[in-house]
């Protein structure tokens, strides 16, 4: 057994997907980019399919290829616009892609003409930038771009989409901004439809929009963070508590030392023992995703009790003040975060992220590859 493990509670994933589906009639496209936010894309996708998930979203062609190699046959949408080098792989693996420029259409059309498969096709979703400022065509270019897709042999229009910038905020100006984005998007959709074009899937809602902006559900939703157990902080605590963390990060006590009063611990001498105490050495550090910004202040759970991490977190290790008298032994399990329903302390990754001045997305994605993923089915 690896000393550092990310326990993936698939029952919690299924529970969260059930909660998501109870809140919308739209299809669910589950984001599994960044290895399913650190949870393991292939195993997560297989579990999600049994819950009725319609499709999956990835950030790049390589992620889509891994899903196909694992036997996932459901629709996959690549959220990044394609490069010339990637298009042949998109076509080969039957991956739909976002486009936002005429040049993307030309690249795909050329690749289709050069394909050895004379019947090859490529599904595309036209992305409209309604205020995010990233990938997407201007709203006044959307209809012409869709018409060009429909007129190009081998290309199939699969959807039209956008992305919200501040759907997780309840500030009045941000609520207005989200509604402005939604209205601009709907104007584009209506204009396209009036031109005689049918759009199979209209989609925009991320996790925050799913919970807070029901008028933005449309035909399909893309809830990532919710599926993995975390709702935006702006959501009412009663709603947030319904979603259960899927990942539990655990390690073990590798060594225990007694240190005298006045002794320093770790780099830069950031912590000094005020009295004689015991410290435990944990074989986990920032290379594993336990960010340096978490100390001081991070608490870990050992045997149902909380202990503070002290001193600077190192690349491969960190130190815990175990106090006196000593109630911990070498080899004891240590939980850094995880769901309470799994018998853990109930300290979620959102608590750690807030302490580190970041967001749960970043903390979950940062859990390193040398942390073994163990799937609890």
Curated annotation (Swiss-Prot):
The active site is at residues 33, 267. It catalyses: L-alanine = D-alanine. Pathway: Amino-acid biosynthesis; D-alanine biosynthesis; D-alanine from L-alanine: step 1/1. GO terms for biological process: D-alanine biosynthetic process. Its EC number is 5.1.1.1. Substrate binds at residues 134, 315. The keyword Transcription does not apply. Keywords: Isomerase, Pyridoxal phosphate. Its cofactor is pyridoxal 5'-phosphate. GO terms for molecular function: alanine racemase activity; pyridoxal phosphate binding. GO terms for cellular component: cytosol. InterPro entries: Ala_racemase, Ala_racemase/Decarboxylase_C, Ala_racemase_C, Ala_racemase_N, Ala_racemase_pyridoxalP-BS, PLP-binding_barrel. Belongs to the alanine racemase family. NCBIfam families: alr. This is Alanine racemase.
